Amino acid sequence: SPFDTRLRLGRSQTRKESIIYFQLDFSEGIDRQALFHILSFISETKNTEVIFGAFSASQEQMEEVESLVNEIIKTQIDTDSLEKGIDYGRAENPLEENGEKELRFQFVNMNDDLDLIKTLEFVRLIVDLNKQPHLYTQIAGISAGIPQINQVETVYVEHLKNGYLISDVTEFSKAAHYYLDMLKEWNQALVYSIDKIKEHTGQRFLDKLHQWIEEVTDVKG
């Protein structure tokens, strides 16, 4: 089976915030418009965060994308709208120890599949708008029951089944709302992922997956 049994289904339902994983691919270059649309979505949608993830990128490449993101925020998005909500009842000082407010995005440079598994643990939505979607990210997404947004059709992601196929980055917000606003659509993607795994795995693993789907369904009702 190509699917990874180390990933646990439905973990994101245990978190209040919806975490989006955005796949970076420096071989294709960085799409500024795509970065803008996802940052804009995060700034306008409460309880959302984004992880910009890359595989084995150089320090220069990571600095480049961080600089570009900061530039987009500075020129096109209100920085305050990207701040994490602060629980004043628990924190005497609303600022972080370094004096900076915590923002709802982060950068992760991963070395192997174990890093990706750790990164995806509580992710609610995967976004890969590259011309060649990252194969292992797609497989990992199915293994964890996470719906995916792509611009290119692949054998792993089917439109409105376990993902959303957009023709242009301007459609990102519509696709993201489809899976983040309503639990029904997200659960359907989770069930579809189980069926996808069923095609490639034995009964023992399948029983374990059904146990997981029952648990996460009970949690959310």
Label for each model-derived stretch:
Residues K118-P133, I146:
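Acidic donor-binding loop of glycosyltransferase active sites
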Residues F3-R104:
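Conserved catalytic-core segment of nucleotide-activated headgroup transferases in glycan assembly
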Residues N93, D112-V123, S143:
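Short acidic alpha-helix that forms the nucleotide-activated donor recognition element
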Residues D113-L116, T137-Q138, N162, F172, ...:
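Acidic, amphipathic alpha-helical patches
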Residues I117, L135-S143, T154:
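Short alpha-helical segment that forms part of, or immediately flanks, the ligand-binding pocket
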